[in-house]
Amino acid sequence: MAIEFQHISKRFADTRALEDVSLTFEEGKIYGLLGNNGAGKSTLLNILTGRLCPDSGTVAVDGAPADSDAALGKLFLVGEKNLYPDDMKVKRALDTAAVFYPDFDRSYAESLAKQFELPLNKKINGLSTGYGSIFKLVVALAANTPYLLLDEPVLGLDAHHRQLFYRQLLESYNKNPRCIVISTHLIAEVADLIEHTVIIRKGRILQDAPTEELTAACWAVSR
């Protein structure tokens, strides 16, 4: 059971976003997809979830084409875009999420909202940038999909909320082991969480190895 990218390439006009990327994300591991802004991280995840089409190459989720209903139902991507109506209240959005994700844990979502002090009766467009991110993370953790994809997940969060999120993420993983991919440029913050590291730079994979191996070799994203 895995996500498999085979020879993925993507260009935007004259800009190379991804070049011949082959990569596997296996179940039951926390991955770090690490790289500077513009390295190609978001493009890769958007191709996986059908928001972008590759120029060449294929993507499969547990053997099914990534753009199939069978595959998409196993994925949850937290990105910059909010997928709920701006004037919808947070509480109503949780109700909606429970309809689309059969394993959605509503009581857990409300528990997370309480810990993060997320106001359930506030409209989504009334949330600050930080609380907008918190809302998306609450839904993501409670959705319990087999593959959780987090693209710069702590955008706008203060230090306290970032640490609370990382702690909750690890607790959630320990209770329900699944494939989690953390795409970020904040390398130091996730170093103790990730088991396997993928380093991407200018659309190419530089390293794809267990985190311990790269740490022992003193690898850095800035290389």
What name fits each language-model region?
Residues 57-71:
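Conserved ABC transporter NBD signature motif
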